[in-house]
Amino acid sequence: MNTTPAQNQTPAQNQNPTPAQTPAAPRGGRAPQRSASSPEGGGVGALTGLGRALRSETLKILTVRSTIVYLILAAGAMFGPMVLGSLLSGGDIESFTLSDLLIGTGIAQVIVVAFGAAGAAGETRSGMVAQAFLTEKSRSLWLIARIIVSAVAAAVMYLIGVALGWAVVQLVGPGLSADGVRPLVGGVIGIMAFAGIGAGIGALLRNTVAAVAVPVCWLFVLESMILMASSAYEMFRPVAEILPGVRVGELSGSGTGMVTEYSPVVDALIVIAWLVVICGLGLWRNRRADTK
């Protein structure tokens, strides 16, 4: 009986390859959960994601040409009046005060609210925000970062304008006499708040023209009309007391005198409440609405 000789096989050839072993899942079929202390989960992960979003929004603002335009406008609104005042004073003014130096704050507020609104609305309308939706863990991260970066950028623009105005007064004008830092502190808080409010309105309306027009009309037209109506009709008085533009003016010490004077802390809390409400509406719209 013929038999076929057995093939020579090495031990390695006789053994079948086994797949790589993976850790068994716990009983119940649930995968192991990440620890909240790991870099990718919990509060640390959220802070890391917000940090990346802040860096991204900062790069966007620094690399678009419109930022330079808004910087020139906001800074010009601050030092422009000082240039004219210094050149036209003719030696009749002994010195300017800090309140005189900040006379252009109202115009700067309108410019930065347009800056914040146009930036947030433009991101959504152009579809750029879709990249943030795909790369970030939460839809809200990009908008929170945009609000923070817009507020900080607006404060920088404002302070640059103040510094240029101070330089003009010191070099060309009669000099500057200090009358307290309240106008400057109130101006910075108002500038940052209005830039953040503008970003919230931009995310809420998602239309660049409407997002810029609504807050500008509110500050220039509606608030003045409500103030005038409150002096004649008592029913408008409660509304006039909490207007954001009015409270920012009271906070910086340049109020109209047509509303109740609260402490600076109360004025700041009212302005912050407006910021939280409007940005909250913007965050809600950002989470619920899709982008094209």
What annotation goes with each model-predicted range?
Residues 2-37, 47, 51, 250-292:
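Alpha-helical transmembrane segments of multi-pass membrane transporters/translocases
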Residues 30-34, 40-47, 65-117, 143-206, ...:
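Secretory targeting signals
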Residues 50-62:
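A short amphipathic helical element positioned immediately N-terminal to and/or at the very start
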Residues 57, 136-138, 207:
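Generic structural signal for small/hydrophobic residues in well-ordered secondary structure
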Residues 118-152:
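Helix-loop-helix units of permease transmembrane domains in multi-pass membrane transporters
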